[in-house]
């Protein structure tokens, strides 16, 4: 793992508003804090604009050469630019639908999410 033997994690926030400075990255910061409180060492937190290609590019850069958890937040709704699932599918090699289903159970609004999970490498 690493010198602290804590599992490693990275966080990607997908939001046009955060990129353009019209919104605070509340969900990304909350996710970093949640992972840290649950024993993960968060080594990277990035922000990208919405769009499948931008998400795929960011996720690939974060995943390649990294053995750990990469989590994204944002862009999983039904608006035209909410394309995080499409970008994620372009990067992962095998889907893990049970993980996405379990995450949706944690929030009453989870059923409105199109989030996906999988592995790369």
Task: Tell where the protein language model's regions lie, with residue ranges.
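Non-catalytic beta/alpha edge segments that cap or flank active sites
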Residues: 1-121
